[in-house]
Amino acid sequence: MSEEKPKEGVKTENDHINLKVAGQDGSVVQFKIKRHTPLSKLMKAYCERQGLSMRQIRFRFDGQPINETDTPAQLEMEDEDTIDVFQQQTGGVPESSLAGHSF
């Protein structure tokens, strides 16, 4: 008998991972992406699907802004991780001046 190791649970660098993109409206869109693919591909696909412009929204992972050149591998993303989407604030008062106010 040959001693082949099971492939289960073994991660290779070319693996795809499933990422969820959660909008402020509660919607969740799932994407499958390679670990070394720039996240700009996912971001653009999300915008097209939701009818949004890249200028209108911001993507964050673990509270940190995501750059278009970032990859899941660089951000140490794992399968089923969630990216949060926020509407870009245009005009109005800066967020810092809203601190301490409840609406």
From Swiss-Prot:
Provide the cross-link position: Glycyl lysine isopeptide (Lys-Gly) (interchain with G-Cter in SUMO2).
Answer: 5, 7, 11
Known post-translational modifications? Polymeric chains can be formed through Lys-11 cross-linking.
- Work out whether the entry's keyword set contains Cytoplasm: yes
Give residues for the crosslink Glycyl lysine isopeptide (Gly-Lys) (interchain with K-? in acceptor proteins): 92
What keywords are assigned to this protein?
Answer: Cytoplasm, Isopeptide bond, Nucleus, Ubl conjugation, Ubl conjugation pathway
The protein's matches in Pfam families, at most eight in alphabetical order, are given as: Rad60-SLD
Q: Name one GO biological process term.
A: regulation of protein localization to nucleus
Q: Which GO terms describe its cellular component?
A: cytoplasm; kinetochore; nucleoplasm; nucleus; PML body
Q: What is the effect of changing residue 33 to A?
A: Impaired interaction with USP25
Question: This chain belongs to which protein, by name?
Answer: Small ubiquitin-related modifier 3
Q: Which organism is it from?
A: Homo sapiens
Q: What is the lineage of its organism?
A: Eukaryota, Metazoa, Chordata, Craniata, Vertebrata
